[in-house]
Amino acid sequence: MKSISGLIAFSALMVTSMSVSASEIRVMSGGAPKEVFAQLAPKFEQQTGNKVVFVYDVLTALREKIAAGEKVDVLVMPVPMLDGYVKEGKLRADSQATFGTVGTNVVVKEGAPRPDISTKEKFRAAMLAARSVVHATPGKTPSGTHMGKVMEQLGIADAMAKKVIHRPALEGGVQLVADGQADIGIYPASEVANVKGIAVVGSLPAGIDLNTLYGGATTADTPAGDAAAAFVKFMAAPENRSVWKQSGFDPPGS
């Protein structure tokens, strides 16, 4: 009887200990790594007992949240932005890790003709021939800002003004292509890698392509210090590289 009572007491102590040591980790991220985190976060939670809460938004909105003092334990965004926050003292440099590089893909509705986008000139012709094109809003995401510049560079900004729909992938932009409401979509490869109803034509051609290096780091004042750092380290671990690759990210430095 004593042994049973002792076992119950020990089990209760272990549960209490785990609940005390477990942390809730709040992660703010742009939309590009969302598919990766959906696959890897449950594995991290199972292995560590920690809970991860994600806040996804376009990068300009994330900047606004940070400026307003919204509390967060980990930031995931393009590395140049992380570097800026490290210099400002808002992120811990020793926790920073790179996750991978994501290119920018052109997509059409599944079964639709695939335009030739092999060169800048052919991409330009494909844009002009399209009934409608959707990409993220310039100024709000790296790909949206880039596409605004590309339209100017190709001299078709005015011609495309009435054709272009500005909608981030997080707000259903890719789905407009799947539903046939837009002929062409242009988004980070990771945001179109596993979407049903669309087909990837290819990446933007040389001269107007965009590759964005993503990484993560813990905030300087996070109360979940070790747990938050463990999350970043886990996501950058070599054994998880295949998940990043399947979701459209190439290894850092590739």
Where do the PLM segments sit?
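Extracytoplasmic catalytic/substrate-binding loops of multi-pass membrane glycan-assembly enzymes
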Residues: 13
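N-terminal signal peptide c-region/cleavage motif recognized by signal peptidases
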Residues: 16-18
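Bacterial N-terminal signal peptides that target proteins for export
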Residues: 1-8
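Exported/periplasmic ABC-transporter solute-binding proteins
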Residues: 22-60, 64-71, 79-102, 108-254
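Cleavable N-terminal signal peptides
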Residues: 9-10, 20
